Regions:
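An N-terminal assembly and electron-transfer interface module characteristic of large anaerobic redox
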Residues: 1-247
Length: 247
């Protein structure tokens, strides 16, 4: 399930996060709190997992913001787990299996591919809505596949190939539009709520939006961990995980 990403999430974040925190932290905490308070979950059988970068960014402090918000809401019994290559916190009972890790990488790769084919095709489509319809078809299919217990690289590679082939088959206009790159803070860059639906705004103004891949951000993080271990005396164990991540 994708967490809600509406204006109400921002309002929820403002309620539970101090007002000198950065905008992305408001949205992240707001999304989590809105989901937990929605009534859709048994609050005695849920846990929150959040990444920690270990750097100077407020992203390292999200876990503290979330715990404080849960305490203010009377939900301090909900565990908040840290997911970090730096090993900032240890979480007993929480293990990432190889199968889970591979499926997470596949999901990220699918997302990056969708951004490339959708943003490249939609501004030029002959039949309005055809690109979004094909995207929705594949999104539903891949969500079901990622949730099942089956695992295989063959299915994954075939999906990548078919996605490209089907988007290539969409009729497009033979015109050229200005290409506008979207850069900035990672959450604001990728979240339509945070960036005021910038991609659709650019397309409505006659441009083609170009978005960097999400996976590139993680590759940067892996390379950064390797550099810190080699040049700055950080733990060598992070190099092993980073090398696996890069490969």
């Amino acid at each position: 399930e994708v967490l809600p990403s509406e204006q109400s999430c921002i309002d929820m974040g403002l309620k539970y996060v101090n007002n000198d925190a950065c905008y992305p932290s408001l949205i992240v905490v707001g999304q989590i709190m809105e989901a937990l308070l929605s009534g859709r979950y048994d609050l005695h059988k849920v846990a929150v997992v959040i990444t920690q970068t270990g750097g100077g960014c407020r992203a390292t402090n999200y876990i503290g913001f979330i715990r404080r918000a849960l305490e203010k809401a009377g939900l301090e019994y909900i565990p908040v787990l840290s997911l970090s290559l730096s090993g900032i916190e240890k979480n007993s009972g929480f293990k990432i299996t190889p199968k889970f890790a591979v499926k997470a990488v596949q999901a990220a790769m699918y997302g990056d591919l969708f951004m490339r084919v959708v943003y490249r095709t939609r501004p030029y489509e002959v039949n309005h809505g055809e690109t979004d319809a094909l995207h929705k078809k594949w999104e539903d299919k891949l969500c079901a596949e990622l949730a099942d217990n089956k695992f295989g690289m063959k299915r994954y590679k075939n999906n990548l190939r078919k996605i490209v082939e089907e988007f290539d088959a969409i009729p497009v206009k033979d015109i050229k539009k200005p290409r506008v790159g979207i850069v900035g803070e990672i959450l604001v860059k990728f979240s339509p709520t945070a960036n005021n639906d910038l991609v659709n705004l650019l397309e409505s103004e006659g441009a083609e939006a170009v978005m960097p891949d999400l996976v590139d951000f993680f590759l940067y993080g892996f390379r950064n961990s390797t550099f810190k271990a080699e040049k700055l005396g950080f733990k060598k164990s992070s190099v092993i995980l980073s090398t696996i991540g890069i490969k």
